[in-house]
A protein has these predicted regions:
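Short acidic alpha-helical/loop segments enriched in Asp/Glu that coordinate divalent cations
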Residues: 42, 131-147
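Residues that define the transmembrane beta-barrel architecture of outer-membrane proteins
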Residues: 110-114
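Outer-membrane beta-barrel pore domains and translocons
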Residues: 1, 121, 132-134
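Outer-membrane beta-barrel architecture
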Residues: 117-119
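Phosphate-sensing "switch" segment of ASCE/P-loop ATPases
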Residues: 123, 149
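Repeated loop/turn-to-beta-strand initiation elements of outer-membrane beta-barrel proteins
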Residues: 124-129
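Outer-membrane beta-barrel proteins
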Residues: 2-8, 136-142, 152-153
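Conserved small-residue
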Residues: 1-106, 148, 158-168
Length: 169
């Protein structure tokens, strides 16, 4: 069965994409569209990349609205698209009317759920089985295996996370 739900009526409709609003599809995930990666430190520090691939601005880091504390984008980091063409990548006011460059990138609601149950009896011997699953589900995982060093000081770094971008690879 395919399972989708959309909000058609909500009393206090603020329009915030992080809350409930009329037209919201249950389970939607909002995020930024990736464009590529920064391959040099100079590229991370210079120029704004628009959705059409053109660059504007000199010595301007176009993703600065995404910085947290002292983090700065560098070689190997993800580059996001400026979808609304304002020269920066941000989430606007975080509302359905002004969501900046955020778009719907997925949905956490399980879809195409299925199950099969069968049984067999023969000479006092019973055999039953149940097979069930989900045909489609998207997730936004925030575990330390996905985003290391974001879950506190005691977070472990796994061996595969040491294989990061370098200009040589």
């Amino acid at each position: 069965a395919d399972s989708k739900a959309k909000i058609t009526d909500w009393g206090t409709n603020t329009g915030a994409i992080t809350g409930y609003y009329v037209g919201k599809e249950w389970g939607e995930i909002w995020g930024f569209k990736t464009a590529d990666a920064y391959f040099t430190a100079d590229e991370a520090a210079n120029g704004v990349v628009l959705a059409d691939g053109s660059r504007v601005g000199i010595n301007e880091v176009y993703q600065k609205a995404l910085y947290k504390s002292s983090f700065r984008y560098g070689e190997g980091d993800v580059k996001y698209e400026d979808l609304n063409g304002d020269g920066k990548v941000d989430s606007g006011k975080g509302t359905i009317d002004d969501h900046g460059d955020l778009i719907r990138i997925g949905n956490t609601t399980p879809r195409y759920e299925y199950s099969l149950r069968a049984g067999l009896q023969w000479k006092g011997l019973d055999f039953d089985f149940l097979f069930q699953g989900v045909g489609k589900r998207e997730m936004w995982s925030q575990s330390s295996r996905i985003l290391p060093l974001t879950q506190g000081r005691s977070t472990n770094i796994f061996t595969n996370q040491f294989d990061y971008y370098t200009p040589e690879n």
